[in-house]
Amino acid sequence: MQRLLLPSLRALTGSRNVGLLVPRVASRTQCGSSCGSQRPLRPGQYSTITEVALQSGKGTVSLPSRAAERAVGRWLLVCSGTVAGAVILGGVTRLTESGLSMVDWHLIKEMKPPTSQEEWEAEFQKYQQFPEFKILNHDMTLAEFKFIWYMEYSHRMWGRAVGLAYILPAAYFWRKGWLNRGMKGRVLALCGLVCFQGLLGWYMVKSGLEEKPESYDIPRVSQYRLAAHLGSALVLYCASLWTSLSLLLPQHKLPETRQLLWLRRFAGGTAGLVFLTALSGAFVAGLDAGLVYNSFPKMGESWIPEDLLTFSPVLKNVFENPTMVQFDHRLLGVTSVTAITVLYFLSRRIPLPRRTKMAAVTLLALAYAQVALGISTLLMYVPTPLAATHQSGSLALLSGALWLMNELRRVPK
């Protein structure tokens, strides 16, 4: 029996030493004639700590805990990549002003695009009933409409693919028993956040389809809803990436010194600053604030422009005044790169593993590359390819910050 089972177990676990995981059996000489036949010991008495048990009733095999962790970690790493793709594609959709081309939302029905001329004409006529066509695109042709429609369609279909990438493997791993209690709660939260993200996306689009006389006759989605949509996507990305790194990368046993404690806290604060800077970019995009002052380092002829606080009450300027929004994004960007530079030099004063040092160097390089992209995007009046690259850079920078934080995390006792 053992000869029959070992090849299957080795194929599943990818280990040549699977034979060590088969339970010992009591011999007839140890238990006497009363045993009758050989009986396996209890599951807790396996010859190694990690258990591999055949469940003959269900026909499934439980992988060793480490192998299961790596499988779940790889899955979540792929999921974080799909979320990054959705964020980038959503940014391009916004930059090409395509987000309001699909004026309704159906989970299943809209998965089939128009195919005939009549269907396209009907879709175009629906779009013509809304402010964006009436005010901005009244001379748009059907061919131009097809382009922006397919941009929004691609973003929505990608979002559905992200949902499937989370939910289907989660159900599979859950059924196989490869998720412990803590991981089950985390996976449920991630899947719930994916569903919430889809609903939030439509809630955002609806704000751009409404008549808004106070919006200076420029149809656009609410910058608040845009920031919420991007923010929830970033939270989903960060949670997925952090969990995957924690499962895939061996944890360092670092000496718990005061210097390391301060470095760990500073790295966490820096990551939070990078997240806030990326989130502020949603307000820049929502208000087209990148086109207000296209000079650097000054804003026009001054360091602090005169129209910085023109709205009343004053707090309204932070979220609705394009000048203030651009000023805040600049300030957050400069503060972030300064904090990352300080973090890098602090890390050089502490003996750290090679992989941790590599994470610090990578984060520093990503920070200066992102600053260069941001300045170039500003000076060139926000061209779509460069602006999309700048948004992608924010994800890369956030990933670098999370990687370094993960390298410095405390080993549980």
Swiss-Prot record:
Reactions it catalyzes: Fe(II)-heme o + 2 A + H2O = Fe(II)-heme a + 2 AH2
Pathways per UniProt: Porphyrin-containing compound metabolism; heme A biosynthesis; heme A from heme O: step 1/1
Cofactor(s) recorded in Swiss-Prot or TrEMBL: heme b
InterPro entries for this protein: COX15/CtaA_fam, HemeA_Synthase_type2, Peptidase_S1_PA
Keyword Oxidoreductase: yes
Membrane-crossing segments per the record: 72-92, 157-174, 187-207, 230-250, 272-292, 330-347, 360-380, 385-405
Mitochondrial intermembrane side: 93-156, 208-229, 293-329, 381-384
Binding site for heme b: H329, H390
Subcellular location: Mitochondrion inner membrane
Keyword Metal-binding: yes
Taxonomic superkingdom: Eukaryota
Mitochondrial matrix face of the membrane: 1-71, 175-186, 251-271, 348-359, 406-413
Example GO molecular function: oxidoreductase activity, acting on the CH-CH group of donors
Membrane topology: Multi-pass membrane protein
Keywords: Heme biosynthesis, Iron, Membrane, Metal-binding, Mitochondrion, Mitochondrion inner membrane, Oxidoreductase, Transmembrane, Transmembrane helix
A matching Pfam family: COX15-CtaA
Protein's GO biological process: cytochrome complex assembly; heme A biosynthetic process
GO CC, one annotated term: mitochondrial matrix
Chain sites annotated for binding heme o: H155, H229
E.C. no: 1.17.99.9
Domain notes for this protein: The N-half (TM1-TM4) and C-half (TM5-TM8) domains are connected by an intracellular loop. Each domain is formed from four-helix bundles and they align in a pseudo twofold symmetry manner. The N-half domain is the substrate heme O binding domain and the C-half domain is the cofactor heme B binding domain.
Family listed: Belongs to the COX15/CtaA family. Type 2 subfamily.
HAMAP family listed in its UniProt record: HemeA_synth_type2 (MF_01665)
Function, in words: Catalyzes the second reaction in the biosynthesis of heme A, a prosthetic group of mitochondrial cytochrome c oxidase (CcO). Heme A is synthesized from heme B by two sequential enzymatic reactions catalyzed by heme O synthase (HOS) and heme A synthase (HAS). HAS catalyzes the conversion of heme O to heme A by two successive hydroxylations of the methyl group at C8, in a reaction that involves matrix ferredoxin and ferredoxin reductase.
Protein name per the record: Heme A synthase COX15
Gene name in the database record: Cox15
